[in-house]
Amino acid sequence: MRFSYPLRMSVIKRGDKEQKLAAFVATYFAQQRDAQDILLIARSIDSPVVKAIAAAVPRVAAVGCAVRIILAQADREALPESWSIGGSVPVDCELRWAKNRRLLEAHEQLVMGSDFCWTGDSMRRDPAKCDAYETFAEGDHLVATTARTSFERLWAASEPLLPQFPPPAGPIDSAAAARGA
């Protein structure tokens, strides 16, 4: 008996990973989703999933989403002071460090809204050196809710790295945000 499951699992070449993640993030924002926090568990600030979200900062800011990131490896010297575009479009962002080394056995994770979830490869594997396993769940409330619950538990056990950055003072013109104006 075969089971049909809505997840799309794939093995992806390391060079294509960031592009595929950026397309997944763009799909989420193209569907005019609710402005829930974007939750991210990543190996480091240099992880392709972090870069994909950083590239989407104009969209994140335009809809008023907050970004909460848990890193398995944190170099305080390399952390950004804030996420902004041209210094003029700040994003509500918090970073935490999961000091427990066992976290490296976990998988990277991105949760957007109530039904978009990406699960990446194990954080012990360097994404720059090998191909990766990943799954994409679009429109799957159960998967996203389960991932959100896991994130919140890990968040509570993690140490703050940076203070929370305040959200923008007023509405953001997405065209101006994209131009960096």
Residue ranges and their predicted role:
Residues 2-39, 43-181:
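PLD/PLD-like phosphodiesterase catalytic module centered on the HKD motif
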